Amino acid sequence: MITSPVVIKNFITPEDAQTLIDEINRPSETNPYPEYYKTRYGGTAYPYNKTVLAIQRKYSLLSNDTHQRLNPEETKQIKTFKSFGSVWLEGSAANPHIDDQSPEEFIEYSTVIYLDDTFTGGDLYFPDLGFTYKPEKYDGIFFISDGDLWRHGISKIESGKRTTLLYMHTTQTEHPEGYTIVDPDLN
């Protein structure tokens, strides 16, 4: 298993990153989200449409494979639980937190993909690992989400707007309350 976050340069193509940003700002179409989205914690900046889903699926599969390769001791198949877009505006920040929290305790791995560089600040930091990452456009960062050691936060956005594509991954297939764990659109 990895012992610190792993950064992969140019994980997303410039064209795909720009398409996602364009879809946030001017959706090509909007459709209702599937029923299982109601059990998801949080929201997304992305509209639900075929353009966004095609890109999300492409990088979901790449992210699943990347986590599997980075964590060869993982014997179960890593799949995407959810994908979402986030837009952080000037003044935004996030205190250290873990991704595997109620009601989504089954999240085991996370991926953050940076779509732009039109901001200052917004570093991703892991206080218990002594690791800080200054985001760069098109990079993907991969880390384990399971447990307090992997607590992470985002420093204050000093200027501009920070746009990301995020994935939460799991090896689990069933939820005790019957929720859809593995996103059928993305795996």
Model-flagged regions — what are they?
Residues 1-77, 183-187:
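Non-heme Fe(II)/2-oxoglutarate
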Residues 4, 77, 105-107, 161:
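Residue-level preference for beta-strand/loop junctions
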Residues 5-7, 85, 112-114, 140-142, ...:
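Conserved hydrophobic/aromatic beta-strand scaffold that supports enzyme active sites
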Residues 6, 77-92:
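A short glycine-rich, His/Asp/Glu-containing loop-to-beta-strand
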Residues 12, 24, 115, 145, ...:
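Short beta-strand segments enriched in hydrophobic/aromatic residues
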Residues 87-89, 102-120, 168-169:
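Short, conserved beta-strand element in jelly-roll/cupin
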Residues 93-101:
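Histidine-centered catalytic micro-motifs
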Residues 107, 120-187:
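Catalytic core of Fe(II)/2-oxoglutarate
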